[in-house]
Amino acid sequence: MGRRILNDALRTIVNAEKRGKASVELKPVSTVMSSFLKIMKEKGYIKNFQVHDPHRVGRITVDLQGRVNDCKALTYRQDVKANEIGQYTERTLPTRQWGYIVITTPDGILDHEEAIKRNVGGQVLGFFH
């Protein structure tokens, strides 16, 4: 049975936020995890992250900001069409004002707002709020 790298990393971030830590170290590294963290940084949920030695097992150091309440990766990839993204966000996120769903699309890994703008669907990786 393989490890769920993205799920483990996001759980580590949530646990560190709950304990009031300033930073957290994530191991091992994946490109999907880096893209997920990039979206979290763009939306202001984490301060910064640095990838150390990405060609080996590597690690990522994440500087936390204290804004993450919950962050989960879906262990099953759920397909979402471009016109169904709004319905999916209403079911998944607590309110419409905050929180983001991360979707892997043919245009790359995007948050749900950008996927709606580009009118592309894909598979849901996870969400954070």
Swiss-Prot record:
Its quaternary organisation is:
Component of the mitochondrial ribosome small subunit.
Q: What is this protein called?
A: Small ribosomal subunit protein uS8mz
Top-level taxon of the source organism? Eukaryota
Among PROSITE patterns, the record links this protein to: RIBOSOMAL_S8
- A GO MF label: structural constituent of ribosome
So what family is this one in? Belongs to the universal ribosomal protein uS8 family.
Its keywords, alphabetically, are:
Mitochondrion, Ribonucleoprotein, Ribosomal protein
**In terms of one coarse class, where is the protein primarily found?**
mitochondrion
GO terms of biological process kind: translation
Give the matching InterPro entries: Ribosomal_uS8, Ribosomal_uS8_CS, Ribosomal_uS8_sf
What GO cellular-component annotations does this UniProt entry give? Answer: cytosolic small ribosomal subunit; mitochondrion
Q: Which gene encodes it?
A: RPS15AB
**Which species is listed as the source?**
Arabidopsis thaliana
Subcellular localization, per the record? Answer: Mitochondrion
